[in-house]
Amino acid sequence: VVIDPGHGGKDPGAIGIGGLQEKNVILPISLEVTRILQQQGIDVRLTRDSDFFVTLQGRTDLANQIDADLFVSIHANSMGKARPDVNGIEVYYFGDRRLSDTIHRNIVRSVDMRDRGVRRARFYVLRTSKMPSTLVEVGFVTGAEDAAKLANANFQRQMAAAIAGGIIEYIQRNLR
């Protein structure tokens, strides 16, 4: 399984309330997802494990070169600072949507967030990965409710557990 923490290094991603940077929210969530999966005996690779920049192509090249079974890109959303009312999770797919549906269901079941659904999108990392892939938007750094949650380490662990639970469920149903 390749876990792809969005942005990093020179690319902070979205910047939200109080200067909250997407890259700094996403990395601890991604590291915790990785830890949980590894505890279950799952081979996990990260596209980045600290604060450095990786190109979009570099992210999917890694997954394609190692012939990964799954690619999970983790991001935080933004709507512009003029819209602090916009909050919630979204999960994206390009081809097969089963992985996205499974992760989405696990998040909605276990994390107190507005549900903005599962959507199809032509994001580069989804189009160019050769395995089932998903992009999870864990909340809005520009959303008043979400930003407070995303900055909280306990919430980050809760979100990571939900994402990892979805990945494990998908593997058990489709890859074993």
Residue ranges and their predicted role:
Residues 43, 90, 114-117, 132:
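Conserved beta-strand segments of alpha/beta enzyme cores
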Residues 40, 110, 114, 170-174:
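Solvent-exposed amphipathic alpha-helical surface segments
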